[in-house]
Amino acid sequence: MASLKSIKKRIVSVKNTRQITKAMKMVSAAKLRRAQENVVAARPYAKKLGEVLERLSKSQDVDGSPLMEKRQGGKALLIIVSSDRGLCGGFNANICKAAERFAKERGSEFTELSMMTIGRKGYEFLKNRHKIYKNYANIFGTLNYQTAALIARELIDGYLAEEYDEVYLLFNAFKSVMTQDITLEQLLPVTPEVAAEEEYAPEYIYEPSKAALLDELLPKHIEVQMFKAMLESVASEHGARMTAMDSASKNASEMIGKLTLQYNRARQAAITTELMEIISGSESIKG
């Protein structure tokens, strides 16, 4: 049986760990509220922009754009949005496994498959397994639209220079604190979602022209999709970390209970042994 001193030391250690996990849970909860507000604000804008692009792309007097041009099977780029920090349950492991699954199931469709990682954890997992086109790390602490726009512009430049022919975006979409859905979207070429036909579709007047507006909105659409994916990932990360730290705190409390019981039993056994020794000594003196 472990000594009283070692058991007490373990109890103190687990209590300190529980204090840390509880603090991390509270911090994640505060960050999650802000991140969730950002996601909720970004979703309607991204959806409405997609609807405008869908209407423009169906117009007969618009020839399209190089960003919508489909090329015959070639080089593909997969963007994986992970996190810079750990202690968030299976958040990073799940997204990396999804990237591995994409490479295994669809890699044969392309002449070459490269990966771009956003977040240190994804890069560390994938760097020795796949060709990493580029890595962005330590950007989530000060995440803003300008950062996402910069990445999107670099992707657009690479696509127009034919460095790759298709771009896919893999990220955790935020559903709730307990649920994050791994989502795969095609970023390039842009393929607007086809909405259901309306009985009465209003005819809009576009200025200066539909073609000019399409050329202006397509890069903006890619920027917005990138920014939204990163916001979704940040909210998912905080939700996953909050859940993981809550679970860790509960496990620590259970362990403290078991160790305390073990400590009390050991202490009781030690006291009983001491009493038996005293009684035995007393009996021997009397005898």
UniProtKB/Swiss-Prot annotation:
Gene Ontology molecular function terms on file: ATP binding; proton-transporting ATP synthase activity, rotational mechanism
Gene3D superfamilies assigned: 3.40.1380.10, ATP synthase, gamma subunit, helix hairpin domain
UniProt GO BP: proton motive force-driven plasma membrane ATP synthesis
Keyword ATP-binding found: no
InterPro entries in the record: ATP_synth_F1_ATPase_gsu, ATP_synth_F1_gsu
Similarity comment text for this entry: Belongs to the ATPase gamma chain family.
HAMAP family: ATP_synth_gamma_bact (MF_00815)
Name of this protein: ATP synthase gamma chain
Underlying gene: atpG
